[in-house]
């Protein structure tokens, strides 16, 4: 089970130089023997496991070196456990960087890797410390799927963290980001000219079986308007917006929550839901197995996030854009965000302005009386190429091979 509330089924198969990956069977063949040391931040995280599966499915040899927050099940790759980490315990995580680096520097699979992939800043620091101890020249890829709140602070602590990241970024072979917003608002302002980036959106993995996409003319399930909030249930403001929407519209609407709530952010969760007959919490779900049934009844999915307002929340592109898009469920999102830019660029959702406490109920009430805008967005979603929502086969192989080839030319 991941931080986003999903469980991954292991049985399923900057302007500083931005590029978009493409499929390539030849690339998969070329990298059949390439050896990857993958440093993930949490072996139990579904997104980490999906990435490892994608690397393996593209013919790469992967050895994982990862801590865990929950005891992981079904480790389906060669793996060295780096111990347990605790969310928010930064002193413990700092110590683990040095202890983990010592272990890595002595591991044959790390020393013999063709490329190192480090997911988040902790693991990037560990990778370079291990390289230093082992005196290696192995290229490192920095995989950045969120810009941590410590990196966006305006005080001395934030400046120190950005300085550390800058030093590491300058030594990486590539930076993989899941949103162009991270490049525009973080990497370019602070690390311009020091990196080469690849855009790696949070698309569904090519190896998974999610079932067919819905038909364009599929009939809506009768009943009240159904709005979903899917994935990482971490935003207190979103939670309150949806509860208020349920209170205002009563039996005309159902709110469906899928995932696991972030207890540090939303301290009172179940009691608020239990007070309302039209709010339903479904708990954890398994991706990709449950996605078709999860999205099938929904009329729209909420795609707003304010947990790190003014920073990461405005720059990211959430999984639900791609999951919902594949199944033809239009997103509703606030303007002024990277998510809104994505929706506008694809013409596949509905945008709303502040104040959301007023505009969201008005919007949903309007969609209930006239569903034409929603149906139009649904048709545009289903008319999009599958590749908009699903990662092409061979993408991981192409990206890794480009780094290996570059190293060989030096």
What are these regions (language model features)?
Residues 354-360, 371-404:
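A charged, aromatic-enriched C-terminal amphipathic alpha-helix characteristic of glycosyltransferases
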Residues 259, 267-300:
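Nucleotide-activated donor-binding/catalytic signature segment of Leloir-type glycosyltransferases, i.e.
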Residues 237, 287-322, 333-341:
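Nucleotide-sugar-dependent
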Residues 166-210, 341-342:
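A short, active-site helix/loop in glycosyltransferases that binds the activated sugar's phosphate group
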Residues 95-98, 138-141, 147-168, 206-212:
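Nucleotide-sugar donor phosphate/pyrophosphate-binding loop at the beta->alpha transition
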Residues 102-110, 125, 133, 142, ...:
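Membrane-proximal helix-turn-helix segments that form the acceptor-binding/catalytic region
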Residues 37, 176, 217-237, 243-246, ...:
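Conserved donor-binding/catalytic core segment of Leloir-type glycosyltransferases
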Residues 3, 7-8, 19-22, 387-410:
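C-terminal alpha-helical cap of glycosyltransferases
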